[in-house]
A protein has these predicted regions:
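Non-catalytic substrate-recognition and accessory regions of acyl/acetyltransferase enzymes
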Residues: 1-117
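Acyl-donor binding region in acyl/amide transferases
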Residues: 83, 91-170
């Protein structure tokens, strides 16, 4: 969970801190929406030709190894075009947004969807938009630093996952 170089104690404390901070900074209704599908809408954006996009804060089981919250950028059909996963924690004595993953659209989404969204959003790529949303969300929560996991410390580099490389499980 989160990063390969963190202890279990650090991970447990991060988990506790994350939910306590969110619960303290959100109304009961917002927190309930965040905990449930489809999530809490952070913003509704209109493209330069009237295209509709949303930024949502949610929990995604598929991303839970990389963090506890995910900011999604979706098109008008609800297709995720980018996602950023993070956990709020205290790291080195500072309130921190710890980014565990930043991903574009799934492989089956035509690249044209990304190009259309980028054009509609005045040249801003979907990943850039979720990064900007994360920075603004962090600012709202008075986060003191934003850090991201490196390739070397990414959770899928931990021994638990490295042992499975190249093996097929049926």
């Amino acid at each position: 969970y989160l990063a390969a170089n963190l202890s279990r104690k650090q991970l447990l404390e991060a988990l506790r801190y994350h939910y306590a901070l969110l619960r303290g900074c959100m109304s009961a209704e917002e927190f309930s929406l965040y905990l449930n599908t489809p999530g809490l809408q952070l913003a509704k954006l209109e493209g330069k030709n009237g295209e509709q996009f949303t930024l949502e804060l949610t929990m995604m089981i598929s991303m839970d190894k990389e963090g506890d919250s995910t900011i999604l950028f979706r098109n008008s059909e609800g297709i995720p075009l980018a996602e950023l996963t993070f956990t709020l924690c205290e790291y080195q004595g500072k309130r921190t947004m710890f980014i565990g993953g930043l991903q574009g659209a799934k492989w089956e989404i035509p690249h044209q969807e990304i190009q259309n969204a980028t054009k509609a959003c005045h040249g801003l790529f979907p990943k850039r938009l979720v990064m900007e949303a994360a920075c603004l969300f962090a600012q709202r929560l008075q986060v003191e630093q934003i850090i991201a996991v490196s390739n070397e410390t990414h959770i899928y580099r931990s021994l638990r996952y490295r042992d499975k490389e190249g093996k097929i499980h049926a």
